[in-house]
A protein has these predicted regions:
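Ligand-binding clamshell of periplasmic/extracellular solute-binding protein-like
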Residues: 1, 6-12, 203-221, 292-295
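Short helices/loops that flank or line small-molecule/ion binding pockets
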Residues: 1, 45, 161-169, 186-203
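Short, well-ordered beta-strand elements
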Residues: 12, 141-152, 178-180, 204
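Short helix-loop capping/hinge motifs at secondary-structure junctions, enriched
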Residues: 20-46
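Extracytoplasmic/peripheral linker and loop segments enriched in polar/acidic and small residues
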Residues: 39-42, 47-48, 52, 56, ...
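Append "and occasionally in soluble cytosolic enzymes with long acidic Gly/Pro-rich linkers
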Residues: 40-170
C-alpha cells in the first residue's frame, strides 16, 4: 500500500516576472516578442488566464501519481486552514472577499487538497479580455513565456512539461506558448534564486519559488511580497526597487496598504485575520503569484 505524509506548511507557486531585463536563456527571437510578453504579464486578465489554465492535478501527478496528487494542491499562497477567526478558516475569509473582485472568482473553492482554480472556460474568458486590450497596445501573438527548469531533475522537467501542455491546451498554442528552457543546475540557480539582483533574473514565469512560515500569523506569508521586501520580490516577481514602475503599474502599492492596515490591528485577532484575508484576496486576484502545491509533505511512502 501507498501512504502519504501530511501536507506541509510551505507553498510552491509560480512567480511572474513583471520587469524582465535578462534574456541570456530565452527562446525569444525578436525585441517585439520580448515587448509583447512584458505587456501581457502586466495585464491582470492575462495573468488570471494562466492561473485558471493550469491543471494542478496533472502537474502534481508527476510527483505523487494521480491518486495522491490532490492531497498536495494549494489554491492560496497562505494555507486555507493556517489560522481561523471564530468558526471560519482563513480560506473562508478569503472566499468572502473574492466575490468583490469579479465574477471570474464565483464558485471557486480555495480549500487545500483539491484543484479549485483549474477552469479552462474561465481561462479562455480571461484571455479573451486580455487579448482585446493587448491587441490595442500592438502586442503580437502568440505570447512566448520562458520557463526555466533544471535539466538534471526528471521530476522538474516532467512538471514543466505538464504546465506547458495544460496551459497551451486551455488557451491555445496560437495564443500562448510555454518555452521550456532546460538549464544546468548552476545556470538554473543563477537565473533564478541566486541571481545577483533583479536585473539578472532570467525568466518570464518560474515554478521554482517556495516559501514556508516562520510563525503562526498570515503576515509570515504575505509580507514577503511588500514592495520593500526586495530580496523576495526579486525572486518571485523580478524587481527589487520599491519604486519600480512595473510594480506600481500592477498595483502593488495598494497591496502594501492592505498589509499595513492588517499589521496595525494588534488587539483583535479575528479582525487582524480578516484584514490579512483581504490582502490575500488582492494577491490571489492579481495572479502575480500563482499557487500550485504544498512545498513539502504530502509525499508518497510505500
Amino acid at each position: 500500500n501507498i501512504y502519504y505524509t501530511a501536507p506541509g506548511a510551505s507553498t510552491a507557486a509560480i512567480g511572474v516576472n513583471i520587469d524582465r531585463q535578462n534574456y541570456k536563456f530565452s527562446a525569444k527571437k525578436t525585441d517585439a516578442e520580448k515587448t509583447s510578453t512584458k505587456k501581457a504579464l502586466l495585464n491582470k486578465d492575462f495573468r488570471q488566464s494562466i492561473n485558471f489554465a493550469i491543471d494542478r492535478t496533472a502537474y502534481q501527478s508527476q510527483v505523487n501519481g494521480k491518486d495522491g496528487a490532490a492531497l498536495a494542491i494549494r489554491n492560496l499562497f497562505v494555507p486555507s486552514d493556517f489560522v481561523s477567526a471564530g468558526d471560519k478558516t482563513f480560506g473562508d475569509l478569503v472566499t468572502e472577499k473574492m466575490s468583490t473582485y469579479g465574477d471570474e472568482w464565483s464558485g471557486v473553492n480555495f480549500a487545500d487538497g483539491q484543484d479549485g482554480l483549474y477552469n479552462p472556460e474561465k481561462a479562455k474568458a480571461e484571455f479573451a479580455k486580455a487579448k482585446e486590450a493587448l491587441q490595442g497596445e500592438g502586442v503580437q501573438f502568440p505570447i512566448h513565456l520562458d520557463l526555466p527548469v533544471d535539466q538534471s531533475s526528471k521530476l522538474n522537467v516532467a512538471q514543466a512539461q505538464s504546465l506547458k501542455q495544460t496551459i497551451e491546451k486551455s488557451l491555445g498554442s496560437e495564443n500562448v506558448v510555454i518555452d521550456i528552457n532546460q538549464l544546468s543546475s548552476d545556470d538554473m540557480q543563477n537565473a533564478t534564486l541566486n541571481a545577483a539582483n533583479a536585473a539578472a533574473e532570467d525568466w518570464d514565469i518560474s515554478n521554482g519559488v517556495v516559501w514556508g512560515p516562520d510563525y503562526q500569523d498570515p503576515s509570515t506569508y504575505l509580507d514577503i511580497f511588500k514592495t520593500t521586501s526586495s530580496e523576495n520580490t526579486k525572486t518571485f516577481m523580478g524587481y527589487d526597487d520599491p519604486n519600480n514602475a512595473a510594480a506600481a503599474q500592477v498595483g502593488l502599492k495598494d497591496y502594501d496598504a492592505l498589509l499595513d492596515s492588517a499589521a496595525s490591528e494588534t488587539t483583535d485577532l479575528n479582525a487582524r485575520y480578516d484584514r490579512y484575508a483581504q490582502a490575500q484576496a488582492w494577491l490571489e486576484d492579481s495572479s502575480l503569484v500563482i499557487p500550485l502545491t504544498v512545498g513539502n509533505g504530502a509525499a508518497p511512502v510505500i
